[in-house]
Amino acid sequence: MVGPAPRRRLRPLAALALVLALAPGLPTARAGQTPRPAERGPPVRLFTEEELARYGGEEEDQPIYLAVKGVVFDVTSGKEFYGRGAPYNALTGKDSTRGVAKMSLDPADLTHDTTGLTAKELEALDEVFTKVYKAKYPIVGYTARRILNEDGSPNLDFKPEDQPHFDIKDEF
């Protein structure tokens, strides 16, 4: 007796390689070009860890968000990759910077912490951040940690003028 064919899933690294291969064909803004106000989406917002966790792809009628480098992206259009039961669902609902840098879905790596990453991992992080997430998915906000220290004081390393889609007069 022959049963149903087993479901095949792309291995995480193979799928990431596929995404990177397709990335050059994705539409992107020209260097130095700021989107006109009419081209911008809704204003971005700050997300606490608890708020971001609500957007982990478990609810069918809710957007799916993930953060990389403190930037929160709406990855709902990639539901087949990030939705419930999908290969990269573990990255959603949190800042998964370390996991993206290491190309790892290990729960210990699904954190914002970049301490101890190698130069090669940091380079991979920047490439995926720019060529995949910034090029393909809308920015909906930032993690509060990116702008505020744990004690609530301002993060002096945060420079609004260096942030994609961050127009401080429109946001606060």
From Swiss-Prot:
Residues 44-129 form the Cytochrome b5 heme-binding domain. Residues 1-31 form the signal peptide. Residues 151-172 are annotated as: Disordered. Disulfide bonds: none annotated. Residues 158-172 have a biased composition (Basic and acidic residues). It is found in: Secreted, Extracellular space; Mitochondrion; Endoplasmic reticulum. Ubiquitously expressed with high expression in heart. Over-expressed in various tumors including carcinomas of the uterine cervix, lymphoma, colon, lung, skin and leukemia, as well as carcinoma of the breast. It comes from the Eukaryota. Its main location: secreted. Coiled coil: none annotated. Induction: Up-regulated in immortal cells. Induced in estrogen receptor positive breast cancer expressing progesterone receptor. Pfam families: Cyt-b5 (PF00173). Keywords: Acetylation, Endoplasmic reticulum, Heme, Iron, Metal-binding, Mitochondrion, Secreted, Signal. The cytochrome b5 heme-binding domain was proven to bind heme, although it lacks the conserved iron-binding His residue at position 82. Belongs to the cytochrome b5 family. MAPR subfamily. Acts as a neurotrophic factor in postnatal mature neurons enhancing neuronal survival. Promotes cell proliferation and neurogenesis in undifferentiated neural progenitor cells at the embryonic stage and inhibits differentiation of astrocytes. Its neurotrophic activity is exerted via MAPK1/ERK2, MAPK3/ERK1 and AKT1/AKT pathways. Neurotrophic activity is enhanced by binding to heme. Also acts as an anorexigenic neurotrophic factor that contributes to energy balance. Non-classical progesterone receptors involved in extranuclear signaling are classified in 2 groups: the class II progestin and adipoQ receptor (PAQR) family (also called mPRs) (PAQR5, PAQR6, PAQR7, PAQR8 and PAQR9) and the b5-like heme/steroid-binding protein family (also called MAPRs) (PGRMC1, PGRMC2, NENF and CYB5D2). This is Neudesin.
